[in-house]
């Protein structure tokens, strides 16, 4: 059985960690949203993710932006007009944010002063399935997974 560690070392007394292993979402759909959250306060990140999960606020898509639509307000806020509404990714990150907040509360940290100091998304496994089609062809039905880790710390 393989072991897995966090990709950053932090002070254990002043920080809290959480991870999601094999989240049922593609890497390219969640990595842009995770990149936006780094450096935010936990309460601010929660409000932002709730707006994204309701489909009220788009996020900029810089890396995997092929054939993506332009959205109003993105160019003014992020200096990038291409974006999307990752509702499923926002819901997964909201659950992860709740987990790390609960971990911080158990450790005795002040949850009002928590800031996201590290968030990383790693590619997970791919379940490769094939759907048979006519004339001997087959269509791929791949299910992609991701691993997400988050570290929050109390700011002074």
UniProtKB/Swiss-Prot annotation:
Coiled coil: none annotated. Gene3D superfamilies: Ribosomal protein L22/L17. Pfam families: Ribosomal_L22. One of its GO terms (biological process) is cytoplasmic translation. It comes from the Archaea. GO terms for molecular function: rRNA binding; structural constituent of ribosome. GO terms for cellular component: cytosolic large ribosomal subunit. Keywords: Ribonucleoprotein, Ribosomal protein, RNA-binding, rRNA-binding. Part of the 50S ribosomal subunit. Belongs to the universal ribosomal protein uL22 family. This protein binds specifically to 23S rRNA. It makes multiple contacts with different domains of the 23S rRNA in the assembled 50S subunit and ribosome. The globular domain of the protein is located near the polypeptide exit tunnel on the outside of the subunit, while an extended beta-hairpin is found that lines the wall of the exit tunnel in the center of the 70S ribosome. This is Large ribosomal subunit protein uL22. It comes from Hyperthermus butylicus (strain DSM 5456 / JCM 9403 / PLM1-5).
